Amino acid sequence: MGLRNFFDRIEPQFLKGGRYEKFFPVYEMVESFIYTPKTVTTAAPHARSYIDMKRIMTYVVIATIPCILFGMYNTGLQTNMAIAEYGASGWRAAIIEMLGVGFDPNNPFANIMHGLLYFLPIYIVTLVAGGIFEVIFAVVRGHEVNEGFLVTSMLYTLIVPATTPLWQVALGIIFGVVIGKEVFGGTGKNFLNPALVGRAFLYFAYPAYMSGESVWTPVDGFSGATALAISASDGHATLPERGIEWMDAFIGTIQGSFGETSTLAAMIGLAFLLIVKIANWRLIVGCMAGMIAFSSLLNWIGSDSNPMFAMPWYWHFVLGGYAFGLAFMVTEPVSASHTNMGRYIYGALIGFMVVMIRVINPAFPEGMMLAILFGNVFAPLIDYFVVQANIKRRAKRNV
């Protein structure tokens, strides 16, 4: 009651004519984060729904929790296993020793705590750097700060390596927010996924920090390829020899970015999004169908020089960022197709493209990021042709 009174008391200072009128978006951001927005429709029709933008974004953040928790655990696990051979150094190791947690990879709490020390700084920098530019654009344009940035910041954090320098983290999210969203008008008007735009910028601007064998496990001197990179060079059949079974990849105890290693965690999040009706199942069906069909075709064609031709669809499903991208990027409602038939086509295009990039392009074993951005670009065109086809069909029916 006291907090509500506080907001009501200072609100006139931020309204039109008030002393801090220009900073109303900042006030509205904090107030609507704590309380349900008071905005209602002023004229008919009055559509009632149990869900609003704030709740949608909250649900998406909730859906990422399994990926966050397992991402911290796996980052700590991979780090602690490497420390056993290469030793510990840096301020994080000092904090771990001060807390008496230790570096035992068999201790889940030690793994989570160590992973938290990598996840938290990246997330804080992402939230602050991107949030500053969100507020700047909101103040200049005179509109509210949308909750969509909470989702963008979380997804962005989950798709970067744990070793990413913090200044690069800030640069990437700023690029994603400004170029991927705000230049098109802000949340709801962007046709590209801002988190992926930021990640793509870092990949092409600083490839040595975003790929390779030394960026996944934050231990000095350690080098280890991802399962997808091993498959690209030696074939997926060699993965068990490297200690990577299919179930390891499904659970996520392999090298990779924070949130992308665990297919299980991503599927739990996707199931939640389907239950609350935020994710559209047509996008998922299309993406899975495109991936399964094209990977099966390449399996049938075969290749003596490219081992990726032999990778079956169920390995594509658990390796790289496919599952995470399917759960949180493909189903993102703003940048995806909006027609029902278009959603099948859009999903199938992404499923086709991710296999195409992984198999045909030898320089880039992970293809989900580029495949989704490619799909984002074509989504409006797909919807256009679907709508035009429907118009022509209805016109012929009425002749």
Language model segments and positions:
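N-terminal signal-anchor module of multipass membrane proteins
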Residues: M1-F119, Y123
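Loop-to-transmembrane alpha-helix initiation sites
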Residues: A170, F191-A195, Y314-G321, R343, ...
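A beta-strand-loop signature enriched in Asp, Gly, Thr, and Trp
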Residues: I284-N340
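Long hydrophobic alpha-helical segments that form multi-pass transmembrane helix bundles
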Residues: G185-M267
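Central hydrophobic cores of alpha-helical transmembrane segments in multi-pass inner-membrane proteins
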Residues: I122-I136, I173-K181
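Structural signature of hydrophobic alpha-helical transmembrane segments
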Residues: I112-T126, T163-G172, T253-T263, F309-Y322
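A generic, well-ordered mixed alpha/beta core segment in the N-terminal half of proteins
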Residues: N146-P218
